[in-house]
Amino acid sequence: MAVIRQLPDRLINQIAAGEVVERPASALKELVENALDAGAQQISITLRRGGIDEITVIDDGSGMTPDDMALAIERHATSKLPDDSLDNIHSLGFRGEALPSIGAVSRLSLTSITAGFDHAWRLVVDGGVVSGPEPAALAKGSMISVTQLFKAVPARLKFLKTERTEQGQCADIVRRL
């Protein structure tokens, strides 16, 4: 009989990420929703190989402080719930799962600047391992780059479609937002 054991946090995060990040389009959706929730008026999106190799979202939203950036990559941390109730949600996202889930299965680079700071800060999550924040350059808002999607769970890559199909699904997500 198999012995029951507690899973390590890294594996728990990778499993949870599968609920949020199924393919490049789902990662892109989460990033664009975050930009919109931050009040962005302009959002630039770059995809390489249908988002499999890279997804970069640059926005002119409110940005984040280094402390908020560190919290944003923790599971269940959010700025979008005004109190302890789910009755008063006015944002696209609120669960605090997107960034930690993406960071658990890829390389996530988060660069942001907000009012009161003379330079931006960059924080990197590589397969769940955090480095930073460190000083960076960015004029306004946030830039989030996701590279090597599913590097921590390569079996997920087998379920992706062609680059063209993944690119089309990313375009569909953006049109719907």
Question: Predicted segment positions?
Answer:
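N-terminal phosphate-binding caps/lids of nucleotide- and nucleic-acid-binding domains
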Residues: 1-177
